[in-house]
Each structure stands twice: as structure tokens, then as C-alpha cells.
């Protein structure tokens, strides 16, 4: 007993040493091949293809003689296919160094070898598979070590020697192609699991493929098939039968993609059967069926009998004890169904075919699915039909990675002969078949692609309404505006009360055509979803061709919401309110309006909504403000006419003016600020500092007009550069504490400036924003305004102080406490307000990424002022 154990130990050491030696030599070859350029690689593989082509007949003969399976002539064709078709397909593939470069996108792809390949080959296609795997391995600069099927060791090794010698003669390293000289399951397992092997390329039975995937390393293992072929009633019968005979008799059915059962519509069943019989195909009689089953299937009837694989129909019939005419090409077994109860509906790898009658298309599809579920999932399914719509339905239904149409399955499945699929002798079955690949395996599967991605700045934009009219009495544009027949005016009650709505009516009355007008005047401050829905209903009833939003930000925002829902009733407020990082890539898109023109006429100088793609709407259920943002909400026309702002009360002018200042400053320091927006931001800031106080205390046409222009200019800037956390916080606490939006911004802004100017705990993420610069941006604003300061820090503080003083000068009490917020209210709401502010859309463009705890502190600081 001890001697036996010692002998086993010695044997294990010998096998291990053999595998270690193969792996070591292969890795040395890998190191040498890594230096090869594309030209040298292509020369080597071309010489391999030529050598294999030269020896395709002797190799085929050797395979048949050694295995006792298959057809000499067909194996010769397979060897030609493995050399000629494979070379033709891969010869122009870039597999070395830089294989692709996109200068515009800044992307470079570099190909590297995956490493040493373990190649496992079957007894069914020994020489052709060896040629194929050797060529795709060396095309990608990967040495390959083979574990051949023991019953085809000699012919497989000869095929490997032929291509190896050609490769070496062309400049490849000596050990670019190797193989296990003394095959065994133990040796194959050791090779697959060896640390010197990078990837396993396995073709064979289910057990071998499973072993390949159990190595803990990448594997390209492809398993067995059980291919159904459906001949539908519109099929060309002669062609379909011919295709099946071509496929099923090729190399005696040993290609795993060959058909295993033909499912035929009942309307043409007899005709198909007769066509088979006309071509020396024997239909097994009912009393012979059991004999055939006993001969073809193994003892348990769950798999093919290995001894009949690749043998001719005549040989199998003789083995089964069935008398058939001389020259019989195929045996067909008529079955009542598929599945375990019908063993001959399994994979048979021989010129034996099951044939089942289908009552209709659904029944046929069920039978095909049953075939695939019986050991063929993921492989191949075939349909013969002239109904192109049915081709697609078949493809959608079948869990097979190759759906072949009007094609012999064996030749069609391997690709390139009958179709445009990648030529291959290793056919992936995807997750259906427990494979990692679902396509035909080729050289592309044996390279690592490294991507060099150069930094890029996102393409930016400058989008505004197509038409912006300004100056006093620019309202007259409505007299000449085209395609105005039915107008709906959206406003708040004040616009009707103070006659502004009538002013618009009067201009529309100057038109040559009779304009029908409907007015929705129920917009409240901080418009709600309920208001938007009510206006949308009126809009749907009236069917306007033009919508005019008349009023402050509330009216314009509400009108945008109505416009959105009127144009596209299926729009989701839930979707529209969601945040985004890039407005062009947002998860929920609002469709562009198509039915109506949208005109905004601002009557306050604050929101800039007349030129922006934003609308702030309050959810009626949660009372939370949400800034909707989509360029579909950009108005078609903005009329910035100062005649509408001459009578705005001082307190409103102060609040809206500070909103303008916040828009301008936040858009200037935004991560998305650009050369196209900063000039607008700066000019708006200067106009506010020059004219707001006068506009509040001693208003005249000039000061009110300048503030009106500043509002629109700031809107133009933040429509494209966006805002920051001042608005994020203001959106939430303004609604919660009942403070006007502009006033809330005024109170927060000095604290935001000081916070943003400090070095960030978390830096902002945006490609164009090269580095943190909010402090210097604020300092630039201070310099532009002529504020005093020797250092950046002093200039930042000067700006924050100037904002604070401006707010005070226009009558704003610059603290939340002074606005009536109690300490108790603050304490019970501040945490939730900070979280909601972080969630706000405006947060994403802030010059530094805020922490929720920091937003909380800003609110606390603003409480005390």
C-alpha cells in the first residue's frame, strides 16, 4: 500500500513539474512577444494561416483516423475555415499598442495581451479548433498552452506543431505554442489552475467548461447546444430541407451548432417529410424508435452515447439494428414532443434528427423553448420562414445567442459563411449557458484594452429666449407678433387690480386680427402645484396659441408650469423636480413645447424668470419649493418694459433687488461660470450697487429701468451658469418661515460669501472648475466695485460687508430673528431645512461642495445676523 502511495506522489510531482515548465516557458515567450509591433504580429499569424492551409488535408485525415469520427472531406473544409476565414476576419484587427484614438473626445485605447492562454480542445473538432485558437492567441500576442482531448492528442498536437513551426520561422518565440504531451484530467486541471495561466479558452463538454469557470480566473468557456430548427408554413421547403441536410450531415453532425430537432408546422409537415425522403433521409418507423433511442442515447437516456458521436447514419442504423437503404444520409425520429420523456430530443452530435409536428406558431415556439431548456440554453436556434416579422418574434422569444434565419445551423452558427457573424469555432452562450460571452469568440476577446482618458471640459452653452425686447413701451411688440389668435394671460390678482392686464389687452387690441383672450389671475406668491394644475385645466379648455405671463417671478413660474403641463399632459411633476448634475443629461427630460408661443413680461425687477429655463413651484402636499429646470421651459419672447415697474412698492423693490444681486454674485462664482456669463454678472452687480438704493428711496425712470435691466441680465447669466447654496437655503427656509424670497437671499448672502471664500472641506466637482477660486472671484467683484482691501481676504470681507450694508440701506432687517423667526422654530426646523437645502438643485453649481452640517451653521448664523 505504501509503495502505491509513493508511486502516486511521484506521478503528481512529475505532472506538476511538467505544468510548471510549460507555464514558465510560456511566460518567457509572453515577455518577448510584448515587444512585437503590429506588423510583426500580422506577419506571424499570416504565416500560420498559410501553413495550416497547406496542411489542411493531412491534418483532416489524421483527425479522422485517430478519433474514428467525422468525415475526412468535411474536416478538411473545417481546417480551411479555421485558417482562411479566421485570418480574413482578424487580419486588419488592431491588437497591438494604440488601437483607437478619438482626438475630439480625448480618448486613446491601447491593446495589451491578456497573458498566457490555456486552450482546451474537443475531440469533435480537434485540428480546426487548435488552428483557430492558436491564431487568435498569437494575433493578440498571447502564448497558448493546450490541453488536448486524449482521444485526439496526436492529430491536435500535429496541428499545433504545424502552426507553431510557421510562427517560429516568422519570428515568434520558441514556446509561443505548447501542449501537454501526456494528457490526463489531472494535468488539464493543473494547467487551468496554474498561477502562470492568465485565461482559460475552453471548448468541450459541460463538465470541462464548468471546470474552466471554477479556476478563479477569467475563462472563455462555451458549452453544448441543443439546437431547434423551426420550419414555419411560409418557408421555402426545398431550401429549408436542403439546409438541414447540409448542416446535419456536415462532419457527421459534430459541430455543436448543428440542429438536433426540426419542428414543422402541421400544414407543411407531410411536404417536408416527403422532401427529406426524396434525398435519402430515412424516417425511422414507430417500431424502430426504441432501438434507435437505445443506440444513440446513453444508459440513463440523459445524454448522447459517446460511441456514436460523429459516425454516419448507416453505421448508427446498423448499431441500432435498423435496416436502412444504402446511401442513407440521415436518420429522422418522429417524436410527439420534447423534454426528458423524449430522449432523442437531446443533443446527439450525429446525423440523427428529431422531427416534431407543431399545431401552430405558438406551439412551435413552445417546442423550440423546450429544446433549449433541455441542455441548449444560450447556444443557437433556427427559423425557416418568409415572415420577417416572425423572425423578430422568434429572436425575442428564444434564449439563444445565435438566432439563425433560413440558414443551415452548423455552417451558420460558426459565422461568416452564410451571414455576417464573426467567424469562430468557439461559440459563446451567454449567461443562459453559464458562459461569460454571448458572441462568437475571436481575437477581440483576448486583449486587455487600456483607455487613456484626457481631461476634457464639458461642452458649455449660452441659451436664451430667441427674442428679448427692452426699453420703455417695448410691449408694442405684441402688436406685430406673428401667429397670435388666442391668448391666455397668466397673472396674479394685482395685475388685474392695477390695470396692467388691461394695458396688455389694449396692445393686443391694436392688432389687425381679432384676438380671443382668456385670463387666469389666481397666481399666489410662491405658486403651488394646485394653482398650476388649475391654470392648466383652463388652458386645456381655452386652447391658446400664445401664453403671456404677466407679473413677477411667481406669475412667470406658474405660467411655465401650466405651459409645460398643457403642452405635454403626461409630464410628471415628480420627475421634473428631480435634481441633475448636468442639465443635458438629466434623468427626466421635459419635452419641448410645440403648440404655443410663450411670452414673459416681468413687472418686478428680481427673478429674471423671463429669460431662464427655471420655475420655482411649491408642492401643495409637502409645502416644499422645488426649482424645476429644463431648457424646454425657456420662454420664446421676453419683453423687459420698465413701464410696468414704476409703481412697485419700495419694500418689494428692495427684496427683488437683493434677489438680483444674489443671482449676479452666485452666477459669477458658480463652477459653471464662463466668459460668456461673467460680464453679464458683473454689470448686473454694478447696476444694483449703483441704482438699488435710489430705486427704493427716490425712484425715477432711470433707476427703475436700470434695475429692470439688471434683473434680466442677471437672469441671462444664471440661466447658463446657474446659482449656488444661497438660493438652495433660501428656497427652503423662505417657504418654511414665510419670508419673501429676495429678502431671504439678502439675509443669507453675506454669510454665504464668507463661507464660500474659505478653503473647502469638500471641493466642487466640475471639469471646467480647475481649482477652488471662490475667494479670488469674490475679490474680483470687490475690485470691480471699487471696494477697499489689500488682500484677497480683506476684499472678500469688504464685499460681504457691502452686501450687508446695502440690504440695511434699503430697509431690510438682516437677520432671520428680525423677520419674526423664533428660536424654538429655528431649533425644530433647522436640521430638516439643511437637508432639504443640500438636496436643492442649486447646490450642484456652488463653488464648493457643502456639508449638511455647514448649511445648518449658515442658517444659524443668519438667524442672529
What do the predicted segments below correspond to?
Residues 459-546, 816:
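ATP/NTP phosphate-donor binding region
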Residues 2-11, 16-23, 42, 282-287, ...:
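C-terminal segments
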Residues 98-239:
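Rossmann-like NAD(P) dinucleotide-binding subdomain of oxidoreductase/dehydrogenase enzymes
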Residues 6, 13, 131, 209-339:
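ALDH superfamily catalytic-core signature
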Residues 270, 278, 611-721:
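Carboxylate- and glycine-rich phosphate/diphosphate-binding segment that chelates Mg2+/Mn2+
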Residues 736, 742-825, 865:
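Gly/Pro-rich interdomain helix-loop hinge
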Residues 2-108, 136, 278:
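N-terminal Rossmann-like NAD(P)+-binding subdomain of aldehyde/semialdehyde dehydrogenases
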Residues 94, 159, 530-643:
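Glycine/threonine-rich beta-strand-loop-alpha-helix active-site module
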